[in-house]
């Protein structure tokens, strides 16, 4: 009888250890998946904000019957991205911008943080956008 009790205790310990290990693996997997969902949600939110911002900038220019205009590099990026669906590279030329009046964007990726708040040369009127 004592031998059976020992076997039951050992078997219970092995099963409990297996369940704890499996639970920890499940927690780690869930945590990893949750972070992935948060990143995807943040990217979707940012894309929605960029789209709304581009619509606003384009609508303002159309109402005033002017060239599209941006105050920062991010404004130029969202306009080029909105208008260049299906393209990968956009080169934005600023009206009367001189030799520094060109901005190149990879519109398949988000704009880098260090480029977002850079002011645009001259008054920011877009002369042309070329897509590649």
UniProtKB/Swiss-Prot annotation:
Keywords: Secreted, Signal, Virulence. Residues 1-28 form the signal peptide. It is found in: Secreted. GO terms for cellular component: extracellular region. May be involved in countering the first line of host defense mechanisms. Impairs the leukocyte response to FPRL1 agonists by binding directly to host FPRL1. Belongs to the CHIPS/FLIPr family. This is FPRL1 inhibitory protein. The lineage of its organism: Bacteria, Bacillati, Bacillota, Bacilli, Bacillales.
């Amino acid at each position: 009888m004592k031998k059976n009790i020992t076997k039951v205790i050992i078997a219970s310990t092995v099963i409990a250890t297996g369940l704890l290990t499996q639970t920890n693996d499940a927690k780690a997997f869930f945590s990893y998946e949750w972070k992935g969902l948060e990143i995807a949600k943040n990217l979707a939110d940012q894309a929605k904000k960029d789209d709304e911002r581009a619509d606003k900038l384009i609508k303002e220019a159309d109402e005033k019957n002017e060239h599209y205009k941006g105050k920062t590099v991010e404004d130029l990026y969202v306009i080029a991205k909105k208008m260049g669906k299906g393209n990968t590279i956009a080169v934005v030329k600023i009206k009367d911008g001189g030799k520094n009046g060109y901005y190149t964007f990879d519109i398949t990726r988000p704009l880098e943080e260090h480029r977002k708040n850079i002011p645009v040369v001259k008054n920011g009127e877009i002369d042309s956008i070329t897509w590649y």
